[in-house]
């Protein structure tokens, strides 16, 4: 199958935030300048994925009470494919007469009690979040739900954002962490828009 364009949730996010930056990167091949990228969120992300994989298919202890009746999808090899943007979720959509390849990589995937699927994403913040961050992540989660649907994995209509933030620091240098789980409603239709 051939396609006219290849997009991902992050590329679409750039389009929404800065159309000129999107044009420069994708048409003129001039990348948007990146500031210093913090390594702490990437480190937390890696630790959390390792933790989830150690429990798979059971949820890690901190989520069992918050998400009763749910499990983690797949085995370690299967989820690692979904975590890689080259082998993750892929679909082709027809938009205004053009074929668009949509690709995305998930942090994890929750299997709901009814057998439907919910994207799960780990986020980090400097303090406990006051809101779910939907203004930043809603469209990304809608696109993941659309990609699940197009890959014959029925989306549940929910996505989970698990925010991790520092809570304490001890005199011997140990840092305590807390987490706050949010549920976003998702829509395949919004993902198409």
Regions found by a protein language model. Give the residues of each.
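Conserved active-site beta-strand-loop modules that form the wall/rim of enzyme catalytic pockets
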Residues: 107-109, 115-122, 157-163
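An active-site-proximal "capping" alpha-helix that borders the catalytic cofactor pocket
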Residues: 137-149
